[in-house]
Amino acid sequence: MFKFLVLTLGIISCQAYAEDTVIVNDHDISAIKDCWQKNSDDDTDVNVIKSCLRQEYNLVDAQLNKAYGEAYRYIEQVPRTGVKKPDTEQLNLLKKSQRAWLDFRDKECELILSNEDVQDLSDPYSESEWLSCMIIQTNTRTRQLQLYRNSEDFYPSPLTRG
């Protein structure tokens, strides 16, 4: 558990930036930190932490699904110049991209979990650390999908229409 807290603090101090866009921001960490701080009391059961993290993951997963759905619907409704509705090529590319990201997210969180003494999700501490990783990765992907719709000229977006 303490390894994760050190990892989390490392992520906070080594935030990555793309132009002025924050890839991992304080909001990503604050909800996770709040859940982990519930364990500051020695009497707190790790299942309280796990339950808190699971609720947060369900919330960020719903936000991801909303952002993905918005990008998908935009491609359906506003095809690229010279392409007729529906733009099946771009829809298929978005689906492939999302599947590839899901695979990346799972592998990335496996990598994080590999640092644990018990690398099994049946262990409540390991599952809590895995959920923390899933939250961070999911928030990052959600922001990326949102940038597609809200991009300026500096950010390449598959949803830019000319």
From Swiss-Prot:
The source's superkingdom equals Bacteria
Gene3D superfamilies named in the record: 1.20.1270.180
- What this protein is called in its record is Uncharacterized protein YecT
Enumerate the InterPro entries for this protein. LprI-like_N (IPR009739)
Its family? To R.meliloti R02472.
Q: What is an example of a Pfam family matching this protein?
A: LprI
**Where does this protein come from, organism-wise?**
Escherichia coli (strain K12)
Query: Which gene codes for it?
Result: yecT
